[in-house]
Every structure is written in C-alpha cells, then in structure tokens.
Curated annotation (Swiss-Prot):
Taxonomic lineage from the root: Bacteria, Pseudomonadati, Pseudomonadota, Alphaproteobacteria, Acetobacterales
Swiss-Prot/TrEMBL GO biological process terms: translation
Protein name in the entry: Large ribosomal subunit protein bL12
InterPro entries (alphabetical): Ribosomal_bL12 (IPR000206), Ribosomal_bL12_C (IPR013823), Ribosomal_bL12_C/ClpS-like (IPR014719), Ribosomal_bL12_oligo (IPR008932), Ribosomal_bL12_oligo_N_sf (IPR036235)
Pfam families attached to this UniProt entry: Ribosomal_L12, Ribosomal_L12_N
Leader sequence residues: none
Gene Ontology cellular-component terms listed: cytosolic large ribosomal subunit
PANTHER family: 39S RIBOSOMAL PROTEIN L12, LARGE RIBOSOMAL SUBUNIT PROTEIN BL12M
Annotated HAMAP family: Ribosomal_bL12 (MF_00368)
Assembly and binders: Homodimer. Part of the ribosomal stalk of the 50S ribosomal subunit. Forms a multimeric L10(L12)X complex, where L10 forms an elongated spine to which 2 to 4 L12 dimers bind in a sequential fashion. Binds GTP-bound translation factors.
Amino acid sequence: MADLSNLVEQLSSLTVLEAAELSKLLEEKWGVSAAAPVAVAAAPAAGAAAAPAEEQTEFTVILAKAGDKKINVIKEIRTITGLGLKEAKDLVEGAPKTVKEGVNKDEAEKIKKVLEEQGAAVEIK
C-alpha cells in the first residue's frame, strides 16, 4: 500500500505537460484511447415523437359549408374579413374556402362561433 501512496504523490506532482505525455504513453502501452465514450441515443419508437411538439399558435379558419342561411353567412364573412359583397359571396358559395389565416386560438374560436350561429360548418386547422 505504501507503494500506491508513493505513486499517487508522484502523479500529483506532475505538470500538465508531463501528465499529458504520461497519458499518451499509457495509451500506447495498453492499446486504449483516453477519449470519452460517446453515448448513442436510441432511435424513437415508430409511433413516438422525437421531441414534444410545440403547441400551435396560429390557426386557419375554414368555411366548410355555408348552410341554409347563406345571406347571413355572407354578412358575417364581410364583417370578419373586410371583403366586398361579391368577394364574400364567392367565398361562401365556393366552400370549402379559407376565411382567415394566421389567427390566434381565441380569435379562431370566436370566428367559428359567429359563423356556426348563422348555420355554417366551420373547421379550424
């Protein structure tokens, strides 16, 4: 045990350059590398996401179907989008069409509620 204590004292007294040289000599002698092992991450399972998905912040409101009260839906579309009468009518009659893009969740829900009150079918994506 005295020899080990003596060895520890000798190693502790080495300079950084001497310690690096000792490390290289031991690597060559033992045929090993002092490089830190790199952990390989396991691949995610087939159905699992690699990282948690970010919560969506921008939504698109889509008019799926105008319903029976087309005139009321056209009026609401004009109010929501600022479109003219002809453009709003074309949007309603050409459903499914995008009403508004890049809106926050609250605004998308509000638009959906207003249009559904007029009998329209609305989707939020």
